[in-house]
C-alpha cells in the first residue's frame, strides 16, 4: 500500500482540507490510488452486501500472517472510502482487525456525520464484512 498514506498522515491530510468539497475530492483521490482489482476477484463471494454501489473486497493473508486487502467499487466516493478503510487496517493480522475499532478514526475525521445514510450503511457493511472474514481466519 505504498501508494496510500498511513493512518496518521491520512488524518493530517484530511484535517488540512478546508471544506467538505476538498475532503470528498481527497477521498476520491485515495480511491484512484488503489491497485486495479482483477476481473476474477469481482465475484459474488467478494461482493459486499448492504452497499448501494457494487463493492468487492478481497482478503488474503501473507506468510507472516498479515492481511492484504484489495477492493474496488463502481462509485468513486465509495472506492475512496474503501481506501480509507484499507489504510486503517494496513499491516494487521486477522486478530488485530477483529480487535481494532475504526469508529474513533471516523469520528476524528468527522466522516460519518458528512456521509449520506446509504453511504454510512455501506461503510458499516464493508467493515462488518472485513471483520467477519478476519474472524474466520483468526
Swiss-Prot record:
It is found in: Cytoplasm. It comes from the Bacteria. Keywords: Cytoplasm. GO terms for cellular component: cytoplasm. Homodimer. Interacts with SufS. It comes from Escherichia coli O17:K52:H18 (strain UMN026 / ExPEC). The keyword Cytoplasm applies. This is Cysteine desulfuration protein SufE. One of its GO terms (biological process) is iron-sulfur cluster assembly. Participates in cysteine desulfuration mediated by SufS. Cysteine desulfuration mobilizes sulfur from L-cysteine to yield L-alanine and constitutes an essential step in sulfur metabolism for biosynthesis of a variety of sulfur-containing biomolecules. Functions as a sulfur acceptor for SufS, by mediating the direct transfer of the sulfur atom from the S-sulfanylcysteine of SufS, an intermediate product of cysteine desulfuration process. Belongs to the SufE family. Its main location: cytoplasm.
Amino acid at each position: 500500500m505504498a501508494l496510500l498514506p498511513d493512518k496518521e498522515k491520512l488524518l493530517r491530510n484530511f484535517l488540512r482540507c478546508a471544506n467538505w468539497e476538498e475532503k470528498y475530492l481527497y477521498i476520491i483521490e485515495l480511491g484512484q490510488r488503489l491497485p486495479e482489482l482483477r476481473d476474477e476477484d469481482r465475484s459474488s463471494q467478494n461482493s459486499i452486501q448492504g452497499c448501494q454501489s457494487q463493492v468487492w473486497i478481497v482478503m488474503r493473508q501473507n506468510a507472516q500472517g498479515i492481511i492484504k486487502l484489495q477492493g474496488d467499487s463502481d462509485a468513486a466516493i465509495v472506492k475512496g472510502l474503501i481506501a480509507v478503510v484499507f489504510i486503517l487496517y494496513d499491516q494487521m493480522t486477522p486478530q488485530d482487525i477483529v480487535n481494532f475499532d475504526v469508529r474513533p478514526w471516523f469520528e476524528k475525521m468527522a466522516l460519518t456525520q458528512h456521509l449520506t445514510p446509504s453511504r454510512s450503511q455501506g461503510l458499516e457493511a464493508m467493515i462488518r464484512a472485513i471483520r467477519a472474514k478476519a474472524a474466520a481466519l483468526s
